[in-house]
From Swiss-Prot:
This is Translation initiation factor 2 subunit beta. The keyword Protein biosynthesis applies. Belongs to the eIF-2-beta/eIF-5 family. The keyword Amino-acid biosynthesis does not apply. It holds the Pfam family TRAM. Keywords: Initiation factor, Protein biosynthesis. GO terms for molecular function: translation initiation factor activity. The lineage of its organism: Archaea, Methanobacteriati, Methanobacteriota, Stenosarchaea group, Methanomicrobia. It comes from the Archaea. It comes from Methanosarcina mazei (strain ATCC BAA-159 / DSM 3647 / Goe1 / Go1 / JCM 11833 / OCM 88) (Methanosarcina frisia). eIF-2 functions in the early steps of protein synthesis by forming a ternary complex with GTP and initiator tRNA. Heterotrimer composed of an alpha, a beta and a gamma chain.
């Protein structure tokens, strides 16, 4: 029987060397828009490439943490339901903390390997390694979909009787003055009353 360290060393010896980079690691800002009752993460492929992770692994994580179903369509990810940029950003950052960043040197030059049925994060920069935790409950703080004073990018789904554009975010109906159906607008939430939100152009 091999011990854990020997199994890890054997696995590492069979993997190609990965060059480290001194370039600043920047996670792309999620580019979201809504289509009907779904949320589209338009630059999902770019995010997965930046993280150097399998898109399917990232997608499974996000759908589990968001508590929804989803699928990958080309370079986009489609999620059932309405989600905000803040919700996606929080979950992507949590994924990076657990599955990408080295806890010893803080660099993203890592690889996921499986050693004796244990998923291990191995750092190519400093050589550190740690088992990846299996989390049953998300540690991401759940936010309200929108908040007063917050700025959001919305797609206008309809126009109300008073001429205001109407968008839906989660349980909220957002009114946007001067917007027309199909517009993608950036707005600031002025007031929330129950499930109604009133905004102005940001």
């Amino acid at each position: 029987m091999y011990d854990y360290e020997e199994l890890l060393n054997r696995a590492m010896s069979k993997m190609p060397d990965t060059e480290t980079t001194d370039a600043r690691f920047v996670i792309p800002e999620p580019k979201l828009f809504s289509e009907g009752k779904t949320t589209i993460l338009d630059n999902f492929g770019n995010i997965a490439d930046t993280l150097n992770r399998d898109p399917d692994h990232l997608m499974k994580y996000l759908t589990r943490e968001l508590g929804t179903a989803g699928k990958i369509e080309g370079t986009r990810a489609v999620f059932q339901g309405r989600f905000t940029r803040a919700q996606l950003s929080d979950n992507i950052q949590a994924y990076v903390d657990e599955y990408v960043m080295c806890s010893e040197c803080g660099r993203p030059d890592t690889q996921l390997v499986r050693v004796d049925r244990v998923l291990v994060l191995k750092c190519s920069a400093c050589g550190a390694h740690r088992p990846v935790k299996k989390r049953k409950v998300s540690n991401v703080v759940v936010r309200e979909a929108i908040e007063e004073g917050g700025t959001y990018e919305l797609r206008i789904d309809a126009v109300g009787s008073k001429g205001d554009g109407i968008a839906k975010i989660d349980k909220y109906t957002v009114f946007v003055p001067g917007a027309t159906k199909g517009d993608v607008v950036k707005v600031k939430i002025k007031k929330i009353s129950g499930n109604l939100a009133f905004s102005e152009r940001a």
